[in-house]
Amino acid sequence: MSAACISYFGGKKLKLTHSYAGKELKHWNQAAFISGIERLLGLYKPETTLKQMNMMTSHDTDRMLDTYGGDEKRLKLSVIFSFLFPGAINIYYGEELGLPGAFNAGTRQGMPWKNEKIWDKDLLGLYKRLAALRKGDEAIKHGKFEFLKEYCDGRALAFRRSSGGEALLCLMNNSSSEVNLALKQGALGNKPGAVLNSGVKLKPAGPKKLTAVLAPWAYAVYRL
């Protein structure tokens, strides 16, 4: 999962040598990303996938900030996807603070507990909100994962987690241009309300229809 996220969300500044994977990563377009994730989900039974440890980085890799070439917009999309993906999220210490570090050149330094000036408080806040969302949501902890391909247009990415009567839908824009998505009636439930939103606006588009306007690198998570 980590290699797929880096290949898709990484962009032009992606560092192609990912030490933990032990191989060179190539850029993926959206079709390749969706295909790769679906193949990954098909390798094991759903109950096994839900117990897998999802680790984006470790002491044997570059830190995420270095992996994404310092591009925090892309980094955030990758973090959100990893938190909402089936399995147990594993966070290497300091990633939530936006610490830099290349493999064997800063990735194993001590945690800067007493130096809050270098903490990325905005990124830390995102990690906290995602952790709280995971903790209290059955759809994320136990639910099915599926891409909503009618809304995946090469720039916008849409996917859903669902379990019983609970569901979450995530929209994100992995591009530098605004995206307008015409949503089907009821796609976001009867009373759309985002539990996480950065740059997504909903506009009426006729009787009981909505258009989701996604700013560049925007994301939103809706509880259905």
Model-derived regions: residue spans:
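Short, solvent-exposed loop/turn segments at secondary-structure junctions
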Residues: 58-62, 97-99, 164-166, 174-177, ...
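Carbohydrate-binding surface patches
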Residues: 148-187
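Acidic/polar loop patches that form or flank catalytic/metal-binding clefts of enzymes
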Residues: 89-93, 138-146
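Active-site-proximal helices and loops of the catalytic beta/alpha 8
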Residues: 1-44, 81, 100-129, 133, ...
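C-terminal beta-strand-rich structural cap/linker in extracellular carbohydrate-active enzymes
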Residues: 205-224
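Hydrophobic, well-ordered secondary-structure elements that form the walls
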Residues: 59, 82, 94, 130, ...
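Solvent-exposed beta-hairpin/edge-strand motifs
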Residues: 185-200
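Aromatic/acidic polysaccharide-binding cleft in carbohydrate-active enzymes
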Residues: 4, 9-11, 50, 54-72, ...
